[in-house]
Amino acid sequence: MGIKGLNAIISEHVPSAVRKSDIKAFFGRKVAIDASMSLYQFLIAVRQQDGAQLSTESGETTSHLMGMFYRTLRMIDNGIKPCYVFDGKPPILKSFELKKRSDKRVDTEKKLEEAVDQAEKLKQERRLVKVSPEHNDEAKYLLKLMGIPYIVAPCEAEAQCAQLAKDGKVYAAASEDMDTLCYKTPYLLRHLTFSEAKKEPIHEIDTELVLQGLELTQEQFVDLGIMLGCDYCESIRGIGPVTALKLIKEHGSLEKIVEFIESGQANNKWKVPEDWPYNEARQLFLNPDVVNSQDINLKWNPPDEEKLIEFLCHEKKFNEERVKSGIKRLQKGLKSGVQVRLDGFFQKVPKTKEQLAAATAKAKAAKKTKGKTGKVSKR
């Protein structure tokens, strides 16, 4: 689910922390991708013209494999070395969110039964999309045949992606979930696995610039995320993004905010949830269950052409000519290796408050300018 309203806060207060770039800008980068989120996207977006999921004659869904194969190829074509991270066992605190999703699913199934209009049916069907263990297993098998490394995280995939980026194994974590920032990935890439047809630039969020711009510590930023609403516990009803940021800045921590509310100084406008496990949620962000990066060896291998054709073409009925063309692209891209970028020789220099304020003002002015060209950075 991510963090409600966090993207809006960053866009409003620190737009300079977000760089919109073409995929070519990440040539030579290694990136850790949230596999579960990507598979969900593929199941939602990769469809036939009538809106139905791609499938074999026997009814087996193949949208996830089509998306995984061709979106990964696009990255390889542009000099990116992807590795995928799959979710492990969800933390106990997440049962709160999983229960909510289960309840919503029951409601959606009812709406689907009642739907008469075809467009409404497709809308409700998309809401019922769920990544199954079979989808995950098939995606892992495909990645193995493609020669693309993958990891199964002990817990949350976003946390493991962030850890790989923090430890320098990869440049950035890629996910649509904004809570990846709470695990303090240096950079978060959004829209990386979107289709080329969408023409959506990749959004690169610099975590350090976000913290500087909001004038928050990492711990305070995590507390802000919990107040906005995360997967691990409910939020305080009635407190939206503007108020949440104001309270964190004024009081500095959730402990102080809870004390402020329960003392009656907030005029009883809000009520803290009973037995609110905000500290446990905080620890899941600050000290997540991840594999030590030193124990992970990311290696990109030559694709297994014969088995790829057998799996995708003979078993899943993909177009053989297109798959063979894709394999050639894969062989070429993986053979070339990761080229060294010139900016890799230079240490990142933190921006001063004045520089950050100037950049933020410039970014805000650009957003307000009419007749935007829509061009993205090529770096």
UniProtKB/Swiss-Prot annotation:
Matching PANTHER family: FLAP ENDONUCLEASE 1, FLAP ENDONUCLEASE FAMILY MEMBER
Requisite cofactors: Mg(2+)
Binding residues annotated for Mg(2+) 2, in chain numbering: 177, 179, 231
Positions of the UniProt region annotated as Disordered: 360-379
Organism whose genome encodes this protein: Zygosaccharomyces rouxii (strain ATCC 2623 / CBS 732 / NBRC 1130 / NCYC 568 / NRRL Y-229)
One GO cellular component term: nucleolus
Known function: Structure-specific nuclease with 5'-flap endonuclease and 5'-3' exonuclease activities involved in DNA replication and repair. During DNA replication, cleaves the 5'-overhanging flap structure that is generated by displacement synthesis when DNA polymerase encounters the 5'-end of a downstream Okazaki fragment. It enters the flap from the 5'-end and then tracks to cleave the flap base, leaving a nick for ligation. Also involved in the long patch base excision repair (LP-BER) pathway, by cleaving within the apurinic/apyrimidinic (AP) site-terminated flap.
Source organism, top-level taxon: Eukaryota
Phosphoprotein as UniProt keyword: yes
The family this protein is said to belong to: Belongs to the XPG/RAD2 endonuclease family. FEN1 subfamily.
Documented EC number(s): 3.1.-.-
UniProt region (I-domain), positions on chain: 120-251
Basic residues bias (residue ranges): 364-379
Cofactor remark from the record: Binds 2 magnesium ions per subunit. They probably participate in the reaction catalyzed by the enzyme. May bind an additional third magnesium ion after substrate binding.
SUPFAM superfamilies (UniProt xref): 5' to 3' exonuclease, C-terminal subdomain, PIN domain-like
Residues covered by region (Interaction with PCNA): 338-346
Single annotated GO MF: 5'-flap endonuclease activity
Assigned keywords, A-Z: DNA damage, DNA repair, DNA replication, Endonuclease, Exonuclease, Hydrolase, Magnesium, Metal-binding, Mitochondrion, Nuclease, Nucleus, Phosphoprotein
Post-translational modification: Phosphorylated. Phosphorylation upon DNA damage induces relocalization to the nuclear plasma.
Complexes and interactors: Interacts with PCNA. Three molecules of FEN1 bind to one PCNA trimer with each molecule binding to one PCNA monomer. PCNA stimulates the nuclease activity without altering cleavage specificity.
Main location as per UniProt: nucleus
Binding site for Mg(2+) 1: 34, 87, 156, 158
Name of the molecule in the record: Flap endonuclease 1
N-domain, as annotated region: 1-105
